[in-house]
Amino acid sequence: MADFRFLQDPASEKWLIMAPKRAKRPDQAKGQEPLCPFEDHLEEEIYTLNEAKVVKNKYPFAPIHEIVIHSDDHHKNFDELPANKTEDVFKVFRQRFLAHKDKGQVYIFHNQGKRGGESLPHPHTQIAVVPEEVKLEIPVLNPRNVVRKELKFHYIFCPNTSQWPDEVWIAPHRGGRMFGQATDEEIQELSFAVSRLIQIFDLRHGEEFPFNFYIYPGGDWYLRLIPRLKTLGGFEIGTNVYINTQDPLETFEFIKEHFDNPDFEKITSQHTASYERSV
């Protein structure tokens, strides 16, 4: 049997991926202290930028499925890596996007923590190139009538229709482009923004919190950061109608207050968040 198959439901016309071999991939996020889980991948490096490395995913669910290993450090992720190393990771994202943009839909996504879908503890991001005929149901950028925090090259906002508590979007001021067209200055600012958001959310939740982010694969690109402390309930799973128990405006005010100069004591004493229960 092939490693994966794309299947379309004839009734709903929605797509799914059948990939039973992925159930056999190692799961080292359960607590044991392993050797580097990517040790046996390094002889097959596809691309390298300083410590950031790209290797093939041994358990793919797409024709092209790569892993970006962030650095040589087994534990430090975006919130703890030096700025230059985080910037290198995002430059690798851009390079791989450009390498694959004519082969399909380049979907860059990151899983952090067990509840965020992470199975290997060494910080890494995945890149899956999905065939064009497979329709990806991803929200499009619609920044109208939203309150923004302005950066030099980007703006940060929390959509009024956020599906997840503390959901945050980052988008460039210059629209109409794909992620591969981001400039070095934009990459530098984007990598800093992601790192800072993770830092203050770590404090807000009192622990290293689980999250996902992805980069929109089409034009008018954006990065969407989704904390994963909330558990989906049966209503949301069955109807695909999400119940958000956190006011996006409160999330935005929290970001606006602490993004530039985080007040660590105030975050931990006054701005903690708790919404782990299902609804």
Residue spans of the language-model regions?
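Active-site microenvironments that recognize anionic phosphate/pyrophosphate groups
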Residues: M1-H122, A128-F179, I198-V279
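Gly/Pro-rich active-site loop or hairpin
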Residues: G180-Q188
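Internal alpha/beta scaffold segment
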Residues: Q188, A193-R196
